[in-house]
Amino acid sequence: MSAAVPYRRVVVDAPEQLRIETATLPAEVPAGHARLRPTAIGVCGSDLHVLGGHHPFVSYPVHPGHEVVGEVVAVGDGVDPSWVGRAVALEPSLACGNCRTCRRGKYHLCEDLRVMGFQAPGAMAELADAPLDRLHPLPDGMPAEHGALVEPLAVATHALRLAGDVRGADVVVLGAGTIGLTCAVVAREDGANVLVVDTDAARRQVAAERFGFQVASSVGEQAFDVALECVGNEAALRSAIAAVVKAGTVMVIGVHGHDPAIQAGWVQDRELRLQGTLMYQTEDVQRAIELLAGGRVDAGAWIDARLPLAEAQRGYDLARAGGATLKVLLVP
């Protein structure tokens, strides 16, 4: 029997309890899987919610890591050996493939969905195994660390795909964190006129100076065709609903830990479209890669810090500080 392979990974044992542990993987990669050596892992707002004890869909301990780029170092039976050495981005959703929504092609809404880094072990680690169909090759010449932005950018490409044609539309984005700004960038790429709203002055400055957006501290009196709510709290969602014109669209992108009280009367009377959006599908991931590889999205504008895996706690602290810090990468 081959010896197990030791590696280090981040574990959150309970709220506010993060540590680095040594674990092992079987020497043989499972059939249909590839073994990934992560080269960069993003610390996401959802990771902060897990550490803070505010994520509604996890049980501790949690092994985080879903914004991941890495190199394939080994493959299991049934996988072409030519995958070894490829740079890949991780699509962390694990679907059953058999439920009603999976059979309809909406695997990201699987009735038994597990997401690596939340309900399944993630890849904030020196090694990780993943099903081959969850790995997306990066084009030659694309800087490897830019692949860590594929996952958050795919959230935006999916949301804008669901929003529909926004060419020439007036779009307001509520929230200037990573997801808000990815949505703003994709909306602008799709031809929209974009206003970014955030109550935090430092984040408004980032949106204006790094990305060239018009910014505001509140929605104000202007009416918009589409509102992209990327905050995940009641006040932001109510502002989004109030901001759109009759027959306008409100995209609920932020994750709400509590059910918000909204203006249902407005939604009905004004024939508003209130659309939720969860994660992404393969076509959204592919578009995210194309935008990054083609230089349509400047990945460097998001990355503020790079830290070794051993300094994961510091990375979380930097990300939690918010303000002008958008994306912290852990580099094993």
Language-model features: where?
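Glycine-rich phosphate-binding loop and adjacent beta-alpha segment
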Residues: E234-R296, V331-P332
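Glycine-rich beta-strand-centered segment in the early N-terminal region that forms part
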Residues: P26-I41, H55-R100, P139-G141
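A short acidic, Gly/Pro-enriched loop at the edge of an enzyme's catalytic core
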Residues: V219-A227
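C-terminal hydrophobic helical "lid"/dimerization subdomain
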Residues: M1-V5, R238, T282-P332
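Local beta-strand N-terminus motif with an aromatic residue
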Residues: G85, A223-F224, A299, A312
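NAD(P)H dinucleotide-binding glycine-rich loop of Rossmann-like/cofactor-binding domains
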Residues: L94-L174, G300
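Mid-domain Rossmann-like dinucleotide-binding core that forms the NAD(H)/NADP(H) cofactor-binding site
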Residues: M142-S217
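N-terminal glycine-rich cofactor-binding segment
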Residues: R9-E28, G45-A74, A89, L109-P121
